[in-house]
Amino acid sequence: MENILDKFLRYISVDTQSDPESNSQPSTNKQLNLLNLINEELHALGIESSVDEYGYLMASIPSNIEKEVPAIGFIAHVDTSPDASGKDIKAQITSNYDGGDILLNKEKNLYLRVSDFPEMAQYKGQTIITTDGNTLLGADDKAGIAEIMYAVQYLCEHPEIKHGEIKIGFTPDEEIGRGVVKFDVAKFGAKYAYT
């Protein structure tokens, strides 16, 4: 089973910035590159999925229980902020974080400082993933995509885990306020959904 970190690193490698100046939906075609990649991954797992003309990917994992229960959904967005470059992202992985400042970029003297972000201390001993200071990281919301896709893969590989119908949705253009403009709630079909 592919680990969640590898999924995340693959997803952030795809530039998916949205464009507030565009009148199309999705606002950039590059968002479709990631949507199509995810769609292929879902098909490889045997999951029915499709991407519509507006850049919404919807998928469904059938229930494997006899009892009828409401469908639940999980949703994440594929676009990244237009405020910083999302091209050629170079993730830096700090394993067993020591609790101190993290150097992002030596040439720019750019650090994540504990004095600026004291909550960093609670992650001592864990793995921290950052940008190299030249681009955004894209964790909003490619971390969400990786979590959802890891869960989907896990459920597909562990049919002994009983569940009702699960709906999956990936949307474009959230960063520019258009993420749900043409999202078809009825087609999605979840009684409850989590983002």
Which residues does each PLM region occupy?
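Acidic/His- and Gly-rich active-site-bordering loop/insert found
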Residues: 2-127
